[in-house]
């Protein structure tokens, strides 16, 4: 996967812009200065800025203060009091696919990227992206030209993840890097890896994305791909991950770093099974929390399902003997509705296929409340045929849009259908402060013309 290889297919995205600008890179003429930029999903307006058209290659490189650690250690980086890196001229890339992507960004103060969208152009498939912003953390993933980020000038993007699906994903890996105002240019991230900074007061000022053939390697170094406010203190190593406070003492508590979660006791990460905060967790050899322990514990006699309506996700819990349901098993992304009820219920029945009130069908339906129409179920279909998926429902998992049911991917709906007996307790609650003991899952978008759920086991290997 990371070898030198053939011609690379490039989606070159750069934010070499001035304050208050929406930038578009695509095949075709740009909008006139001062106008809005239309996409298939709506309009992004730049206020007093202007729309520019760009095609080409990578954005600027930066020169932050950087210390290379010994092998096995985490890279360290220090930031000056003022931003030192700004976007520069786009540099063409040999072998690039000209105008391979439609890119739109809104640029705020100090060249901050406040929101962005991407769309594949001339390549079959879909591209999706999730961003971490200063005033909202990790936002729901978007894709296929839908804007991700903030709508106000006080929002800026600190980090990003990118993924491709469909035919594009069969032949290419997606690599991406950017420049942060303080940290400088980051190394290349690949296929959903996190790139940028988190909680350091830094922000992206440029971005580039490259599609590389599966047999080819990365277009450059991976060094300095990501920094968090823990980067200077955490050292990740098998069986010996440590976290040292600034004063040299060992840290005790939870740490989230690079989309992984750790728990430290006196500076050393715990491994294996541990009771923490009233729950029982499993950690791997590096100390990273395992956020799906289904394969480790096997099918249980009973489960409890806790649905966070506010944040559109749920966590399945298993029983730990007399301690009750304190073992988080897995998290699932949901799409609830305004009418989804709060409270504690017991599931009364299941349906392999179910005809819905809006004349659609759904798979693996588990009723939540006896005598009422609220169900756990897959995304809806036009007919009782798994190749008639309503794609918009799949791509909007994580968004409140059902009539009150709790929508899931086919795989997750099937897991509940197969594993949770009639009478399973379901707790539906609101908590905007935390999705639960695990991270909120994200959903990579699928192409708009794909009418089957990629998680459906009926299409395994397709």
Predicted regions and their residues:
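A mature extracytoplasmic/lumenal domain signature
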Residues: 122, 133, 166, 213, ...
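Gly/Pro-biased beta-strand-loop elements
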Residues: 296-388, 461
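Lectin-type carbohydrate-recognition ectodomains
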Residues: 28, 34, 42, 47-49, ...
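Ser/Thr/Gly/Pro-rich low-complexity, disordered linker/stalk segments of secreted
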Residues: 29-88, 452, 459-462
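Extracytoplasmic/secreted proteins, especially bacterial periplasmic and envelope-associated proteins
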Residues: 115, 159, 206, 329, ...
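Gram-positive cell-envelope targeting signals
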Residues: 1-36, 40, 160, 207
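Exported/periplasmic cell-wall-interacting domains
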Residues: 355-462
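Extracellular adhesion/carbohydrate-binding repeat motifs centered on closely spaced tryptophans
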Residues: 21-22, 26-30, 84, 96-97, ...
């Amino acid at each position: 996967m990371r070898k030198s290889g053939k011609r690379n297919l490039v989606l070159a995205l750069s934010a070499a812009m001035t304050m208050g600008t929406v930038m578009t890179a695509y095949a075709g003429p740009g909008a006139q200065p001062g106008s809005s930029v239309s996409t298939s999903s709506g309009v992004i307006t730049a206020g007093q800025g202007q729309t520019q058209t760009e095609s080409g290659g990578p954005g600027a490189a930066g020169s932050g203060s950087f210390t290379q650690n010994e092998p096995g250690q985490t890279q360290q980086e220090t930031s000056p009091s003022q931003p030192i890196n700004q976007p520069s001229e786009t540099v063409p890339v040999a072998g690039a696919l000209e105008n391979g992507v439609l890119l739109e960004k809104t640029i705020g103060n100090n060249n901050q990227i406040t929101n962005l969208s991407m769309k594949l152009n001339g390549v079959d498939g879909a591209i999706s992206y999730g961003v971490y912003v200063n005033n909202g953390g990790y936002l729901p993933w978007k894709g296929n030209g839908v804007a991700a980020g903030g709508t106000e000038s006080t929002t800026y993007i600190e980090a990003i993840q990118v993924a491709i699906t469909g035919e594009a994903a069969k032949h290419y890996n997606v690599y991406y890097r950017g420049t942060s105002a303080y940290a400088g240019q980051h190394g290349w991230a690949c296929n959903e890896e996190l790139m940028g900074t988190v909680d350091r007061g830094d922000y992206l000022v440029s971005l580039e994305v490259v599609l590389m053939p599966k047999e080819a390697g990365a277009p450059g170094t991976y060094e300095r791909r990501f920094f968090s406010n823990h980067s200077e203190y955490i050292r990740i190593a098998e069986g010996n991950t440590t976290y040292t406070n600034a004063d040299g003492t060992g840290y005790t508590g939870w740490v989230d770093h690079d989309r992984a979660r750790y728990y430290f006791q006196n500076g050393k990460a715990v491994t294996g099974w541990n009771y923490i905060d009233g729950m029982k967790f499993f950690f791997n050899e590096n100390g990273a929390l395992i956020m799906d322990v289904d394969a480790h514990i096997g099918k249980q006699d009973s489960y409890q399902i806790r649905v966070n309506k506010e944040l559109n996700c749920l966590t399945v819990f298993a029983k730990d003997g007399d301690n009750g349901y304190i073992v988080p098993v897995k998290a699932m992304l949901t799409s609830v509705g305004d009418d989804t009820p709060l409270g504690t219920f017991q599931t009364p029945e299941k349906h392999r296929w179910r005809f819905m009130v809006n004349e659609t069908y759904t798979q693996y339906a588990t009723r939540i409340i006896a005598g009422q129409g609220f169900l756990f179920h897959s995304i809806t279909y036009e007919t009782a045929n798994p190749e008639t998926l309503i794609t918009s429902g799949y791509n909007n998992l994580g968004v409140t849009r059902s009539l009150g049911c709790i929508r899931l991917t086919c795989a997750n709906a099937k897991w509940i259908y197969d594993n949770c007996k009639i009478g399973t307790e379901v707790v539906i609650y609101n908590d905007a402060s935390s999705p639960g003991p695990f991270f909120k899952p994200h959903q990579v978008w699928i192409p708009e013309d794909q009418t089957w759920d990629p998680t459906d086991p009926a299409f395994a290997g397709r």
